[in-house]
């Protein structure tokens, strides 16, 4: 009986661990402020490359996950100048279908885009 209880506990821990191992790779979108029905976001590819979704002046190029931080690098395209940047965001929550990032006091809520 004790072995069955121990086995059940171990299997439960394995199942919980598997549920919390959501991948950050993929397409993530959020609503565009002030533009109902429009979305913007980014794609995180498995090779460390990144790209922007519906953001003409913010071109993501690379990403890296370090602990609970997401580093997004790219180029900000402005009038007659391009500026390289790296955004450091704290990963507050990651599930199979949602990603919540924090930059300072700002919370950014993304949904996985499966299209």
Where do the model's predicted regions map?
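Lipid interaction determinants
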Residues: 17-115
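Sec-dependent bacterial lipoprotein signal peptides
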Residues: 1-19
């Amino acid at each position: 009986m004790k072995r069955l209880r121990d086995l059940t506990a171990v299997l439960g821990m394995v199942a919980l661990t598997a549920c919390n191992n959501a991948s950050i790779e993929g397409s993530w979108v959020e609503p565009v402020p002030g533009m109902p029905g429009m979305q913007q976001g980014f794609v995180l590819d498995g090779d460390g490359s990144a790209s922007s979704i519906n953001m003409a002046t913010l071109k993501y190029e690379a990403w890296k996950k370090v602990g609970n931080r997401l580093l997004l690098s790219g180029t900000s395209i402005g009038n007659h100048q391009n500026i390289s940047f790296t955004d450091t965001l704290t990963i507050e929550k990651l599930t199979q279908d949602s990603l919540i990032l924090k930059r300072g006091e700002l919370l950014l809520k993304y949904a996985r885009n499966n299209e």
